[in-house]
Amino acid sequence: MTGFFTILSFSLAALSVTNAAQILSVPKGAEVVPNGYIVVMKDDTSQQDFSSHRVWISSIHHNMTRRGLDGAGVKQTYDFDHLRGYSGIFDEDTIKDISNDPKVAFVEPDAIISQHVVVQQRKAPWGLSRLSNRRGGRNYVFDSSAGSGVWAYVVDSGVDVRHAEFQGRAVWGSNLVDNKNSDGTGHGTHVAGTIAGKTYGIAKKAKVVAVKVLNSEGKGPTSGIIAGINWSIRHARKHGMLQKSVLNMSLGGTYSAGLNHATAQAIKAGMFVSVSAGNDNINSNGNSPASERSVCTIAASTENDGKASFSNWGPAVDLYAPGHNILSARPGGGSQTMSGTSMAAPHAAGVAAYLIAKEGIPGNRACLRLKQLSQPTIRNPGPDTTSRLLYNGSGR
C-alpha cells in the first residue's frame, strides 16, 4: 500500500519540529490504557486528507508489530462533522511520527472513564415529586405527552431492555466495550429507568437506546466513550432524530480535550447532552466530560435541597438535580436505590426529553430552557456554583 507521505512527495522526516502536534498528558496516577492514544485532527482537515492519513497509519501497522507491540494499530475511527480522529495502540516512535503530521491537532493518552455512583440502599423515591413541585410535594406532576417521540441515548454500562419498566420502548444500539449485550453493573439500567421508566421515569413515553461503553466493573477507555458519542450522532441523524434526542453520560474521568471536543459535537449536531459532575466533592473543571461548557453538567442534591456531600461543584455545573437515594430499575426486574451524580444527570435528561416533546424545542436548546425554569433553592451549593435546582415547569 502506498504511504500517505509518498503520495504527497515528501516525508515525515522533512517536517519541521515546530509543526509537531502537542502530546497532552494526564494527571499523575490516572489509569490509562497501556500504549493507548487518542489522535484528533485539526478542524480544517478535509475528508481526503483524513483518508490519506489513515492509509499511512495502516502502512506502519506492520512496523509496530515487528517492534514487538502486539495488538497495535487503529481501534476506533471518529468522523464527526467537526471532529476527525482515531484511537489505538501505538509505541512511542509511532506517536512521535503521528504528532509530526501538520494535520494533527493533538494526541492524548487513552484514560479510563468510570461511572459516577457511590452507594446503594433501600429507601423510597423522591426525585420525581421534587422536580415537579417548586416547594416540594409527594406527587409527580407532568403533562401526558411524557416525552413521546423523543429518543434517549444512554451511553453507559448497557440497559436491560427487556425490563418491564420500559414497556418495549428500549432497544440495543451499540456495544463498544465487550461482546455482552447486558448490563453488568446495573448502572445503565438504573439511569435509563430514571429517564424513561414507566414508574421511576420522567419521560415515560420516550424511547431508550442503549449504547454500551462501560464494562462489568463500570469502566471503559475514553476512546470507547468518544466512539459511543460518534455512533449516537450518526444513528440519530440516520433516523432524522438529532433535534429530538437526548444523550446522557453518567460517567467521567480525568480531563480529556478529545472527549470534551467529541461531546460538544453532539450539541452542535442538535442533541441535548447531560453529564454527571462527579462524586469527589471537588471542582468539576478538572473532569471530563463535565468540564465541557456546552453540555448540561449536573450536580447532585439531597431530599432537603442541599448539596449532596459527595457531589462535585464549580462553575461548570449548570444545575442541581436529585441524586441521593434514588429508586429506579434493576437488571433482571425489580428496583434498587443508588446515589451519585450519575443519578442526578438522568433527571435532567428526562426533563429535557419531556420539554422537547411538550414544547417542541430542539434538543440543543433544552439546557437553556432547563436553566430558565430552574429554582434557586440549593443550600450551600459550593464555591462559584449555581444554586438552581431542576424543575419541569408544571406550575405547582
UniProtKB/Swiss-Prot annotation:
GO cellular component: extracellular region
InterPro entries in alphabetical order: PCSK9_ProteinaseK-like, Peptidase_S8/S53_dom, Peptidase_S8/S53_dom_sf, Peptidase_S8_Asp-AS, Peptidase_S8_His-AS, Peptidase_S8_Ser-AS, Peptidase_S8_subtilisin-like, Peptidase_S8_subtilisin-rel
Chief location of this protein within or outside the cell: secreted
Family annotation (Gene3D superfamilies): Peptidase S8 propeptide/proteinase inhibitor I9, Peptidase S8/S53 domain
EC annotation from Swiss-Prot or TrEMBL: 3.4.21.-
Glycan attachment positions: N63, N230, N248, N392
Any one biological process term the GO annotation gives: proteolysis
Enzyme type, top EC level: hydrolase
Signal peptide: 1-20
Pfam families reported in the protein's UniProt record: Inhibitor_I9, Peptidase_S8
PROSITE patterns: SUBTILASE, SUBTILASE_ASP, SUBTILASE_HIS, SUBTILASE_SER
Residues of the propeptide: 21-116
Location(s) in or outside the cell: Secreted
Catalytic residues identified in the record: D156, H187, S342
Domain Inhibitor I9: 37-113
GO terms, molecular function: serine-type endopeptidase activity
Polar residues bias: start-end ranges: 376-389
Alphabetical keyword list: Glycoprotein, Hydrolase, Protease, Secreted, Serine protease, Signal, Virulence, Zymogen
Domain Peptidase S8: 125-396
Region (Disordered): 376-396
Function: Secreted subtilisin-like serine protease with keratinolytic activity that contributes to pathogenicity.
PANTHER family documented for this protein: ALKALINE PROTEASE 1-RELATED (PTHR43806:SF58), PEPTIDASE S8 (PTHR43806)
Family: Belongs to the peptidase S8 family.
Name the UniProt record assigns to this protein: Subtilisin-like protease 5
Organism: Trichophyton verrucosum (Cattle ringworm fungus)
